[in-house]
Each structure stands twice: as C-alpha cells, then as structure tokens.
A protein has these predicted regions:
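Short, flexible helix-loop junctions that flank or precede catalytic/ligand sites
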Residues: 1-381
Length: 381
C-alpha cells in the first residue's frame, strides 16, 4: 500500500491525473479529466501521516513559514517521476494538501489544440501579453508553450519570475533565467524591478497579484520589453476592468492610456471535456489589441464593446470568442453537442448557428465589422 507522498504521486502520474488531494480522515483523491475520484484502496490519511508527508517535502525555512502562516506554496520534484506544484494549508486544525502534476514535456501550441494565432502572438517583440482563466484552466501550460516557442525561435534573454517554478526551460536559441519567489527573490514586484536592470528581452511574471506588480509590468512593457503574465479572470473584458480597478480612481484614466498603448493580446481559456473522453481540450477566447479595441480600453463607455469587437475580428485578426471556439471544437468533433451547449455563453444562439440559421448576433457582428473597418481606416490617416 502507498505510504509516502512519492508513492501517491506515482499513482497520480500513472492515472494521468492533474491533481492529488489529501485530507485527514479521507482517502486520497485524484482529479482525472476534471473529475475527483477517491483511491479507496489506500487507507484514510491520519493526522500524523499528513504532517509527515507535508514536512518531508519542505526545507527548514518552508517549515518555519508554514508554522507561521498555516499555508505554503512550493515546488517538489521526484527523480524519474516529475515535478509538482504543492499547496499546503490548514483546515479544521489539520494539515491539508493539493499537489498539481506538472508535465515533464512542454507541449507546443499545436499539441495543446490552441488557435494558430497563438504563434503570431509569440512573434511580439514588446508589449503585454496576458493568459487568463480560473484555477486549473491550463494557464501555466499555455504560457510554457509560448515561452518555449520564443526560446526556440529567437535569441532573447528571457527572465521568468514564478511562485513556484513549474516548467523547467532549457536554453535553445534564447538564454533563460528562472527565479522563484521566496527562494531566489523576495516577491514578484521586487524581482520585476530587478529584471529591468538585467538586460531582458522577455519577462514572464507568474501572476500579476497587486498594484505594484501590475504597475511595474506596464512600465516594463512600455519601455520595450515583452511581458507575459496571468490573471484569474474569465475573459478579456473582465481582465481589462480588473487591471484598471486595482488603481485608485484618480489614476485610472492614465492607466487606461498606458494599458491601451502596451497590451498586445489577451488569451482566456477554459478546459472542456473531449468527445472521446480522453482528457480535456481548451476553449479559448483570443483578443488582439487592434486600434478599435485600444479605443475601447481608453474610453470607459466603450469597454463593454470589446466582446463584440472580438466576435467581429475573426477573419481579419484571428480573434475569437468562447462560443466561436466551442463551435470550432464541435465542428472538428473534438467535443459533443451537449458539452458545447453546457459551456456556451448563449446556448440558444449556439443551436441556431449549428442549424445554419442567422441570429441577432450575426447581424450585430456584421455591423461591428463595418464599424471596426471604418475606425481602422480613420486611425491610419
């Protein structure tokens, strides 16, 4: 019977799990294809076993921090098995843990079934690129694919700032330094400020969590660097509103201008179940910062139109909404109609589209296409 955390992690990898959940008094649980499944053949975890497993993965400094704060993020590696992102916490007076399996191989955007425009985004030399979504939506995997493509195609100096380091990048054409918060640096904002003095071409910030980090990331993008980061937001519109809302109202007009000048793309994703039940596939919203969308960022009254602009920017810019992505996945028979309808923002219009019937959104999209084309022509004058 598995008795150590390494044994349980081996079970997780063998079962192609994304996560291992451990709780005192319960069997271990694995999340496989988005569903939690108990390992009923493994004895329920005792408080002593849980504490022993947690502390076996920690350094002395991490043990001290956990005793002080009752929660800890860290990375853990098992030779010959892989790397894992670990969150340790207290619940009802006992230790609990969730361990995320980090794939050993960095998959390409094609292998991840991401839209072709992702590779175009990878060609950006400067500005801000954001990957957003809920926890477990594959943000880190997509960012790793983007960094790996830059690494393979450009002779850049890439600095990553992560908490903790997940994917390990080896130098290809690029030269990569990976820094871990609380191991190699105090925090995201400190490391980001330092990175600006380290001759970077591209900087990955694991997460933009606070005003100082967001402000420094915008400055880095504004001064000619490519900055990649994540936010826990559902789509492009919410992402833009979240960034602006972090700042005090007197500063928000300037932040809108700064964001409009630096933002290149927002990639928002959700994982949906495959039709063949062999895992999940990302449904992806892609926003490219065109002249019209930059105007929507600057003008608070037009920010709500970003979703419509994305829907209208498919053919010319490679943008797509979640529903357009779901339709594409359904058309390729990668997901079922039931899964598509369950995930669609507007299930009724999705049904009409499947039947080839025009809907109100089709007319709105065509009108938006005309508005965007007129705006782009005016902006070029």
């Amino acid at each position: 019977m598995p008795t150590s955390v390494d044994d349980l992690l081996r079970r997780a990898v063998e079962n192609k799990s994304s996560d291992l959940h451990l709780k005192v008094g319960n069997h271990p649980y694995l999340r496989v294809d988005g569903l939690l499944t108990p390992l009923t053949d493994v004895p329920r975890v005792t408080p002593e076993e849980m504490l022993s497993m947690a502390f076996s993965m920690m350094t002395n400094r991490q043990k001290q921090k956990f005793k002080e704060t009752a929660e800890l993020d860290m990375a853990y590696g098992v030779a010959g098995l892989g790397r894992f992102r670990v969150n340790v916490f207290q619940q009802r007076g006992n230790v609990g843990m969730v361990l995320r399996v980090i794939p050993t191989k960095i998959r390409t955007s094609e292998e991840l079934n991401l839209p072709p425009v992702i590779n175009k985004i990878c060609e950006e030399q400067r500005g801000l690129v954001l990957v957003t979504g809920t926890t477990g939506s594959g943000k880190s995997t997509t960012l790793a694919a983007i960094i790996d493509r830059v690494n393979a195609t450009r002779a850049d100096h890439i600095i990553t700032i992560e908490d903790p380091i997940e994917f390990l990048h080896r130098d290809k054409k690029s030269f990569i330094n990976q820094r871990e918060v609380e191991v190699d640096t105090a925090n995201f904002s400190t490391a980001l400020r330092a990175a600006l003095r380290q001759d970077p071409d591209a900087i990955l910030v694991g997460e933009m969590r606070d005003l100082e980090t967001i402000s420094t990331a915008l400055l880095a993008a504004e001064t000619g660097h490519l900055v990649l980061s994540t936010l826990h937001t559902l789509d492009a519109t919410e992402t833009i509103q979240r960034i602006i809302a972090v700042f005090p109202p007197p500063e928000q007009k300037q932040i809108r201008l700064q964001l409009a000048a630096t933002l290149k793309a927002v990639v928002s994703q959700r994982l949906v179940r495959r039709a063949d039940d062999k895992g999940r596939v990302p449904a992806v919203e892609i926003m490219i910062a065109t002249a019209y969308i930059r105007d929507c960022i600057i003008n608070p009254d037009k920010t709500r139109l970003i979703h419509d602009a994305i829907a209208a920017g498919t053919s010319q810019y490679g943008m797509q909404t979640f529903d357009q992505s779901l339709f594409d996945l359904y058309s390729k028979q990668l997901i079922t109609i039931d899964e598509a309808l369950a995930r669609a923002s507007n299930a009724d219009e999705f049904k009409l589209r499947i039947q080839g019937i025009r809907s109100a959104s089709d007319a709105a999209r065509e009108e938006m296409e005309r508005q965007m084309a007129d705006f782009e022509r005016f902006a070029r004058r």
